[in-house]
């Protein structure tokens, strides 16, 4: 998250740079930049310079081209005069520290230039991977959404990029679609159950082998009756599947797409605002560079005595350069505020999407568990429908059946004898 603008404090000269207390002209004060370079500020005119000012009013002890308006310090790093880039296109912009900015003058010949501290990609500023320490994850052990979707990703379908947040939204919408398709799958399962129950009930009314008699006939009648009982079990199973599995899956988060659309627009608006702020920063940086070049040109004119009005022009150029620096400071501040707001909303929203995904998965898991439970119950009920059949089949007695049939259909028990002559 961005921090507020920081104004460096006055510090004594570091060892090795100035061996004794520096006597500065009235109104001038000495400061250290975050990179350890000393610069000087005139608190009366807001003029800044890298070179120690002399006692002569308006002119520093060293060549004037090194004097400039000092850009703002944000998050501990100075913005530099890098070329502007249109915010609507994907691009990468390196931010160098003040020590690298040619517009702000060079340091002593033996001083090394500082490396880039930040890198800007699609208007979002990140720490430069070569110079900044590794950041601590917000939720290190959880593979959380809030840690892994800050950058944009190249769109495999085209030449553009897809925001990390957009990928999360796509996953949410895909999850909603999967939930809908699961509901449709259960509906097809219900249709199969209903059709199966209908066919079982119809078959149970079939008259085939209805004339079977005896204990086997009773067992056969029970077989047909068990089909009717099983049909009832499957009808109840299909009804419970509809009310306890299919319907909840279909109706879960009915307005989810609308909610996600609002969420998408909210984050997209913040991102657009960030891009607009970034464009303002680049415009202000370009303006500062132009003012500094103008100041340098007028200073060179003074050195070669081209005009009697050059010294007055230099003062005007310095005021304009200072104003340009102030404008850049204000634009960077507004940019950091916009990025901070986007950052906060990203963290809050991605954590909410994470919670919604956990909730969706858990809801589906519970209803699929309900499906398997109903399936187990159906199996038990089906088993109960065949138990009477098993009992009657164990009682089938061919001898008893023969007795009953003979008693009912006998034609006589007197056997024939031989004929007499």
From Swiss-Prot:
Record's compositionally biased regions (Polar residues): 41-52, 95-117
Low complexity: bias regions: 53-65
Matches recorded under SUPFAM superfamilies: BAR/IMD domain-like, WW domain
GO MF term (any one): actin filament binding
CDD domains hit by this protein: F-BAR_GAS7 (cd07649)
Gene3D superfamilies linked: 2.20.70.10, Arfaptin homology (AH) domain/BAR domain
Region (Disordered), start-end ranges: 1-117
This protein's record includes keyword Glycoprotein: no
Location of the F-BAR domain: 141-401
Coiled coil: 254-328
Keywords tagged on the record: Coiled coil, Cytoplasm, Developmental protein, Differentiation, Neurogenesis, Phosphoprotein
Localization annotation: Cytoplasm
Principal location class: cytoplasm
Function: May play a role in promoting maturation and morphological differentiation of cerebellar neurons.
Name of this chain's protein: Growth arrest-specific protein 7
The organism of origin for this protein: Mus musculus (Mouse)
Lineage: Eukaryota, Metazoa, Chordata, Craniata, Vertebrata
């Amino acid at each position: 998250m961005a921090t507020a603008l920081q104004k460096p404090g006055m510090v004594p000269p570091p060892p090795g740079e100035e061996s004794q207390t520096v006597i500065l002209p009235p109104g001038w004060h000495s400061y250290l930049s975050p990179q350890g370079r000393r610069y000087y500020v005139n608190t009366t005119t807001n003029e800044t310079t890298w070179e120690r000012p002399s006692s002569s009013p308006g002119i520093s002890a060293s060549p004037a081209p090194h004097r400039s308006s000092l850009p703002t310090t944000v998050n501990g790093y100075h913005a530099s005069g890098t070329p502007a880039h249109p915010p609507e296109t994907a691009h990468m912009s390196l931010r160098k520290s003040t020590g690298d900015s040619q517009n702000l003058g060079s340091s002593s010949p033996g001083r090394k230039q500082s490396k880039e501290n930040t890198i800007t990609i699609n208007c979002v500023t990140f720490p430069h991977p070569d110079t900044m320490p590794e950041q601590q994850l917000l939720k290190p052990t959880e593979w959380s959404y809030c840690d892994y979707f800050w950058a944009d990703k190249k769109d495999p379908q085209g030449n553009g990029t897809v925001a990390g947040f957009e990928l999360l939204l796509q996953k949410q919408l895909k999850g909603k679609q999967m939930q809908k398709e699961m509901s449709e799958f259960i509906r097809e399962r219900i249709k199969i159950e209903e059709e199966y129950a209908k066919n079982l009930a119809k078959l149970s009314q079939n008259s085939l082998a209805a004339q079977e008699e005896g204990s086997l006939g009773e067992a056969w009648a029970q077989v047909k009756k068990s089909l009717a009982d099983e049909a009832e079990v499957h009808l109840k199973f299909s009804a419970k599947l509809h009310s306890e599995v299919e319907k909840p899956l279909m109706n879960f988060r009915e307005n989810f797409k609308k909610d996600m659309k609002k969420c998408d627009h909210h984050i997209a608006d913040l991102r657009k605002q960030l891009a607009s702020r970034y464009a303002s920063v680049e415009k202000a940086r370009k303006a500062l560079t132009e003012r500094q070049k103008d100041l340098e040109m007028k200073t060179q004119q003074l050195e070669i005595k081209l005009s009697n009005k050059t010294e007055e022009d230099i003062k005007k150029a310095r005021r304009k350069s200072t104003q340009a620096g102030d404008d850049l400071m204000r634009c960077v501040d507004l940019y950091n505020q916009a990025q901070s707001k986007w950052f906060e909303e990203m963290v809050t929203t991605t954590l909410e999407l994470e919670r919604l995904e956990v909730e969706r998965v858990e809801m589906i898991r519970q209803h699929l568990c309900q499906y398997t439970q109903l399936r187990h119950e159906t199996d038990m009920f089906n088993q109960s429908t065949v138990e009477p059949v098993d009992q009657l089949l164990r009682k089938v007695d061919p001898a008893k059946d023969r007795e009953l049939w003979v008693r009912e259909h006998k034609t006589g028990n007197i056997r024939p004898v031989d004929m007499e002559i």
